[in-house]
Amino acid sequence: MKFLPYIFLLCCGLWSTISFADEDYIEYRGISSNNRVTLDPLRLSNKELRWLASKKNLVIAVHKSQTATLLHTDSQQRVRGINADYLNLLKRALNIKLTLREYADHQKAMDALEEGEVDIVLSHLVASPPLNDDIAATKPLIITFPALVTTLHDSMRPLTSSKPVNIARVANYPPDEVIHQSFPKATIISFTNLYQALASVSAGQNDYFIGSNIITSSMISRYFTHSLNVVKYYNSPRQYNFFLTRKESVILNEVLNRFVDALTNEVRYEVSQNWLDTGNLAFLNKPLELTEHEKQWIKQHPDLKVLENPYSPPYSMTDENGSVRGVMGDILNIITLQTGLNFSPITVSHNIHAGTQLNPGGWDILPGAIYSEDRENNVLFAEAFITTPYVFVMQKAPDSEQTLKKGMKVAIPYYYELHSQLKEMYPEVEWIKVDNASAAFHKVKEGELDALVATQLNSRYMIDHYYPNELYHFLIPGVPNASLSFAFPRGEPELKDIINKALNAIPPSEVLRLTEKWIKMPNVTIDTWDLYSEQFYIVTTLSVLLVGSSLLWGFYLLRSVRRRKVIQGDLENQISFRKALSDSLPNPTYVVNWQGNVISHNSAFEHYFTADYYKNAMLPLENSESPFKDVFSNTHEVTAETKENRTIYTQVFEIDNGIEKRCINHWHTLCNLPASEHAVYICGWQDITETRDLIHALEVERNKAINATVAKSQFLATMSHEIRTPISSIMGFLELLSGSGLSKEQRVEAISLAYATGQSLLGLIGEILDVDKIESGNYQLQPQWVDIPTLVQNTCHSFGAIAASKSIALSCSSTFPDHYLVKIDPQAFKQVLSNLLSNALKFTTEGAVKITTSLVHIDDNHAVIKMTIMDSGSGLSQEEQQQLFKRYSQTSAGRQQTGSGLGLMICKELIKNMQGDLSLESHPGIGTTFTITIPVEIIQQVAAVEAKAEQPITLPEKLSILIADDHPTNRLLLKRQLNLLGYDVDEATDGVQALHKVSMQHYDLLITDVNMPNVDGFELTRKLREQNSSLPIWGLTANAQANEREKGLNCGMNLCLFKPLTLDVLKTHLSQLHQVAHIVPQYRHLDIEALKNNTANDLQLMQEILMTFQHETHKDLPAAFHALEAGDNRTFHQCIHRIHGAANILNLQKLINISHQLEITPVSDDSKPEILQLLNSVKEHIAELDQEIAVFCQQNN
C-alpha cells in the first residue's frame, strides 16, 4: 500500500505529458534575466491602464526559429536571451504577468494569434513585418545589420574586390545582388547552419562570411574569438523583429509601441552588451536627432572625401584598395550606418599635407586629427573621442633612463603642438621635425635618432608589432594629452554638427573596444614605400654615380698605364737610335751642325733621292740648291729662343727628290753635346704624300656620301609627295563613285580620271626604274623603223587638252621629207619628247609652245634628226641651268609644281644612249628652247618592209586556269578579268593549296602571286618544275625591278608580269599561249593500252575501274599501316595481297614489284624498318598514280 502514492504521481505525470504533447506549443515556466537595466515609467492613458488591469496576463507566442542569442531556454525551461531581457523589461514596465508559448514554426504562432489563443507574436528577424490586413506590427524591437567577417590574421583584406572570392552565408541572407555590389566575381556558398558557415571561413575554405551582426557576433564570441573578426557593417539589407498583434487589439498595439519608444539606445546597448562581446550596434536602433537643415545637407552631400594617412596605426591605415581601415575606418563605418554618408579616401603621407596644404574643396573630412589651437585657425574640429598621452620612444637598454640627455637628437612630427613647449622644457636637446611619427620608429631603432615623440597608442602599436624587444616608451611629464577627433574645412559647420551628433551617439565603451581591437590586431603590414621612396631614389642615384665615377677613374688609370707604356717605348726607341741610327729607322734621318751642314744621315736618307739629286741634298741647308733651304732658317730661329729645350718641331712642306715633288712632315730637335761648344740638330721626315692623297680621296668620298644622303632625303620627300598626290586623287574619285549622286557621265569621267591618275603613278615608278636601269647599264634600246612626223604629231595631240585648258597655243611643224623612215627606239624617243613637252606646258602660263622637226641628210643611209621644243614660259637663270640635268634637281618654279625631278635627267641619258645631244637655251621671263639632235639610219618608205596589217588578237579557247594569290581582292579582280575573256578559273589561297590542286587536277595555265605565305610563287614554281611539270606558269609581282623578273624566270616561270595586270596585257600574253590541243599525255605508270584491251576501249568502264582502284587502295594502304603498328600480321598480309592483285589487273609494274616484295618479307621486329620503307614507297607511288588518273579522267570527260 505504501507504493500507491508513487504510482498515482507517476500516472499523473504521464497524463500531463500526454496532454502537453497534444498541444501545438510548449509553455515556458518563466523568464530568466539578470539584467538590471531600468526604464522610465511609461506614460499610459487611463484607458490603457484599465485595459491592462483587466487583462492581467499577456500570452506571447514565439517559435523555434528564434536563434539562441535572441531566445533560448535553460535547464528549468525558463527563457533567456536578448528578447527575454526585453520581455522582462516589458513585464516590469506594464506590471503584468507574461505567459510565453513556443510554437513549432512561425505560421503556427500566427494561426494561434488569429484564433485568439495568444495576444502577441514576437517575430523572428525579418526584412519587414508580414503583410496581413488582420495583423498589426509595432515599431521594431531589434535592428540588425549585415556584417562582413574574415579571419583575424587577414583582417586587412580588402572590403571590396573585383577578384574571385568565396563568400559564405546562411539561409540566403543577404541576397546575391547585395553581395555582388562589393564582390562582383564572388562565389556564394549558402549554409543551413551558422556555425558551419563561420567554421568554413576559419578553416580557410571561404574568404568571407556575411550575416546578421547580432547572431554572427554572438557565435564569434563563443567559438571563434581568436580566429574570426568583423571588419565591416553594411547599411542594408537590415533585419528586424516586431511585436505582432491582431488588428482589433489597438490598445495593446499602442502600449507595445510606447514600450518600444521607451527603449533608448543606451538601454538597448546595455541589454545587448550582456550577450555580445563584439558587434553590439544596438545604439543605432534609433536614428540621430538631426535638424531638417542637417538632413537636407546630407541629401546634397552624400559623398565625402576623406583624407587618409596610411602610416598612423592604429588610428588609420589603408588596405590594398586604399580603403580607410583602423580605428578611424571602423568609426567612419558606424557613421555611415548612422547618417548614410559615404566616404571616399584620399591618401596622403602625413598630416601636415592633410590638414593645411590642400586646396579648399579638395577634401571634406580628416579623421584622427590631433587638436591644436594653431590649426583651429585653418580647420574645424569635432569633439574629441579619443584622448591619449604623449610619450618618448627610445631604444631599450639595461641602463635605460626615462629622461632626455644633453645633445640627444629627438624627432617630433610637424603636426604636434608640443614643439615649442618641449623646446623650452629640454633646451639642450636637438629637435628634428619629421613628416610622420610611424616612419621615425625605424630611425630610433637604427640609432639615427635618440628619441621620438609619439602618442601612447601609436607607440604601443608600433613597439608591440615591430620593435617588441628593441624599443620602449615612457610618458612625457607636464604636457597635455593628445585629443584625437575629426577635422573639417572651415566652411562646413553643418558637417561638424552632424559628425558631433554621430560621435556622441557611440558609447565610449565601443570606442575603447575598437581601439583595443586594432592594437591587438596581428599581421598588419604597413606599406612605407611612399615614405622611403625619395631616400631610396637618392641612395640609388648616389650608388650609380659612385659606381660610374669608379669605372671612369679605372678607365682613366688604364689609359694612363697604356700612355706610359707608349712613352716607355719611345724612350727605348731613342736609345736604339743612339746605338744604331742608320739601321733602326726606316724614315730618312739626318744630323745638322750649327752651320747648317749635314754631318750624318741614315740609309733611308740616301735612298730617298736619286743619285744625281743626292748631291743637292748634301749641300748646306742655307744653300739655295738644297731641298731643305726652308728648314734651316726656322730651325735657327727656334734654337736661338729655346736653346735648352728639347722640343721636337714639325713642319709640313714639299721637297724635290729628283723625280717629283713629295709632301713630307719634317721634324727637328736640338741636341746639346756636353763635349762641344755648339749644339746639333737631329732632323728627319716622314713622307705623307700617299696619306695626304688618301685623306683627300676620303674627303671627296665623304662629300659624295653626304650629297647622296641629301639626295636620298630629297628623293624620299619628293616621292612621298608624288605618290600621295595621285593616290589621294584615286581615293577621292573612288569615294565619289561609292556615292549614288553621280550621273552616268560623271561616273564615266571619274573612272577615266582615276585610271589616268593611276597611269601617271605607274609612269612615276617607271621613271625611277629607268634611272636605275640607266645608271646600272641595263637599259637596252630597241630601234625600229619609225615614221617620226606621225610619232611627233600623235604625241603632240595627246597634250592638246592640257594646252587648251591653259589657253596655250600648241603647234607642231615638220620639214621631214615624205616617205622616209628612221631607225630609232620609238618608246625612248617618245618618252623624251613627252617629258620636254610636259615641262614646257607646265611652266608656261600664257603664250605658245612650238615643236619643229627636221631631217638633215648625211648620206643616202644616214641623217640627223633635229627637233626643237620652244616655250614662252618663265625661263631659267644660269645657276638653274647648271643644276637642271642632275638627279632630283628642281628649279624654284619647279618646286611649286608636281614632279619627281628625274625627267630631264632621264631625257639627257636617253639621248646620250642614242648617241645624240640635248641642249637648251633659256632667258628668265622670255622662255626656254630645248634642241635635240640624234644621228639615225634612214630608209625610204617604199623600200622598207611594209608593216603588216595589225592582226586581230586571237585568244585560245577552253583554257583551265588556276590562280594562286593570298590577297582575296587580287584573286577576285584577276578571276573577273579571266571570266570576262571566257575562261574557267579555279583559286588557291597559297602555294600549298596550289600544289595540292595541281596534283589532283589538270590545268592549262597557272598564274601565281610571287609573295604568299607558307610557299611563295618562286618556291611553288620550283616544286612544280621538280615534278617535270610542263604547266605554263606566269608570275605576278608588284616589285617592278628587273631583278625580280629575272628571279622568276630563273626559277622556271614562263613569264613574270608586273602588277597591275590590265585586260590588254592579259589578251596579249594569252594570245601568245599556244592553243590547248587534245594531246594524249605521256603516262609514266599507267598502262593505258592494257586497260583499253581489257575493257574493249570502253572509256566509261576504264574510268570506273581506275576510280575503284583509287578508292580501294586508299582504304587498304592505311589499314596495312595500322595492322603493322598493331602487330596484326594476318590483316597486314590481306591488305598487301589486295593491293598486289589490283596492280596485276592494271599491269602496274612498279606497284607489282613493291607489293610482291612486301608479301614475301616476313614480319618481325628486325624487318619492320624495311617494311615501313617499302610501305612509304607504295604511298608515294599511289600519289603519282592519283595524278595520272586525274589527268586521264579530265582528258576523257
UniProtKB/Swiss-Prot annotation:
Catalytic activity: ATP + protein L-histidine = ADP + protein N-phospho-L-histidine
Cytoplasmic topology ranges: 22-325, 559-1197
EC numbers for this chain: 2.7.13.3
SUPFAM superfamilies per UniProt: ATPase domain of HSP90 chaperone/DNA topoisomerase II/histidine kinase (SSF55874), CheY-like (SSF52172), Histidine-containing phosphotransfer domain, HPT domain (SSF47226), Homodimeric domain of signal transducing histidine kinase (SSF47384), Periplasmic binding protein-like II (SSF53850)
Residues in compartment: Periplasmic: 347-537
Annotated ranges, domain Response regulatory: 960-1074
Domain HPt: 1098-1197
PROSITE patterns: HIS_KIN (PS50109), HPT (PS50894), RESPONSE_REGULATORY (PS50110)
Modifications after synthesis and translation: Activation requires a sequential transfer of a phosphate group from a His in the primary transmitter domain, to an Asp in the receiver domain and to a His in the secondary transmitter domain.
Keywords, sorted A to Z: ATP-binding, Cell inner membrane, Cell membrane, Kinase, Membrane, Nucleotide-binding, Phosphoprotein, Signal, Transferase, Transmembrane, Transmembrane helix, Two-component regulatory system
Localisation per UniProt entry: Cell inner membrane
Keyword Transferase: yes
Record-given protein name: Sensor protein EvgS
Originating gene: evgS
